[in-house]
Amino acid sequence: MRVSDFNFDLPDELIARYPKTDRVSCRLLQLNGENGEIFHRTFSDVLDLIDEGDLLIFNNTRVIPARMFGRKASGGKIEVLVERMLDEHRFLAHIRSSKSPKEGAELFLGEDKLGENNGIKAVMKARHGALFEVELSDKSTALLDVLQTIGHMPLPPYIDRPDEEADQECYQTVYSKVPGAVAAPTAGLHFDENLLEKLKAKGVNFEFVTLHVGAGTFQPVRVENIEDHVMHAEYVEVSQEVCNAIIATKKAGKRVIAVGTTSVRSIESAALSAEEFGNPDLIEPYFSDTSIFIYPGKKFRVVDCLITNFHLPESTLIMLVSAFAGYKNTMNAYKHAVKEKYRFFSYGDAMFINKNSNVRGLE
């Protein structure tokens, strides 16, 4: 399969640069992966699409204000995007500057907010491929506190605007809990407290996994043959409680519904790990990095339905959706979405997809 197989034309005006003021008011394209049928709805209609006893799996990661601006000791400007927090004072980051900082270089962060010569001092300790290991010099303040003071919300590049105060709330799910993501699990942005309460009242069950979304989620696939692509690694937690709920749901003949591709990748990583250790019919707790890459031809061991946003052309995420709903069904649904002027990407509209259990390759 070629990367170009997953391309589609998207007018720039369909890229959502601001969210809806009412989370549940976005549009919802319902896709039946078995037969390709499409229905146009509003997101609040998920209440009618999810049955009593079904299990919703959410990703409870919380986006950190991971983007910082500053300068090197030489005076050169830098932009720092935290990729992963290593401990209270060390982190891995992408650094943009005219010249990459060398090991031992001093960095002064947050001068855009704290004022010139008042930046928070840090040191570049080592380089790990494309990432830089950075350590705060002042050990009296934790990294999260520093980010809350000087950091900016790391809006995706396609939103193409500076972050605003409203993004601190809008680019965060209402159930986010565990800090560590540098991109939001955007399918969850459409749920508000009222909808969650209505789902609970209907008898829908909830469980939460944690996958800290990294900046690598926006990296393009740089090989022509998608089987040659190597996914970036992200940290995942799937608890015993989640596993028990999934097993009970399956035994009851109900559906496991993943909210977002990150929830899919978390659950399927845990199931794949169990299979590799000789338990093909089970899902087991998983606390580790995952670099699982799901594309047409890969099977889904757990997930029955998927709630997701509309993704970038040629991205690993549209490949995952194509594996779930079928390639032809997915590309046809995207064609319909463009024609009907759905809003795309992180702040855009959503899909509700039933799995195609018979799909193989580019079908």
Swiss-Prot record:
<keyword id="KW-0949">S-adenosyl-L-methionine</keyword>
<comment type="similarity">
    <text>Belongs to the QueA family.</text>
</comment>
<dbReference type="InterPro" id="IPR042119">
    <property type="entry name" value="QueA_dom2"/>
</dbReference>
<keyword id="KW-0808">Transferase</keyword>
<dbReference type="GO" id="GO:0002099">
    <property type="term" value="P:tRNA wobble guanine modification"/>
</dbReference>
<comment type="pathway">
    <text>tRNA modification; tRNA-queuosine biosynthesis.</text>
</comment>
<dbReference type="Pfam" id="PF02547">
    <property type="entry name" value="Queuosine_synth"/>
</dbReference>
<dbReference type="GO" id="GO:0005737">
    <property type="term" value="C:cytoplasm"/>
</dbReference>
<comment type="function">
    <text>Transfers and isomerizes the ribose moiety from AdoMet to the 7-aminomethyl group of 7-deazaguanine (preQ1-tRNA) to give epoxyqueuosine (oQ-tRNA).</text>
</comment>
<dbReference type="InterPro" id="IPR036100">
    <property type="entry name" value="QueA_sf"/>
</dbReference>
<dbReference type="InterPro" id="IPR042118">
    <property type="entry name" value="QueA_dom1"/>
</dbReference>
<keyword id="KW-0671">Queuosine biosynthesis</keyword>
<keyword id="KW-0963">Cytoplasm</keyword>
<dbReference type="GO" id="GO:0051075">
    <property type="term" value="F:S-adenosylmethionine:tRNA ribosyltransferase-isomerase activity"/>
</dbReference>
<protein>
    <recommendedName>
        <fullName>S-adenosylmethionine:tRNA ribosyltransferase-isomerase</fullName>
        <ecNumber>2.4.99.17</ecNumber>
    </recommendedName>
</protein>
<comment type="subunit">
    <text>Monomer.</text>
</comment>
<dbReference type="GO" id="GO:0008616">
    <property type="term" value="P:queuosine biosynthetic process"/>
</dbReference>
<dbReference type="InterPro" id="IPR003699">
    <property type="entry name" value="QueA"/>
</dbReference>
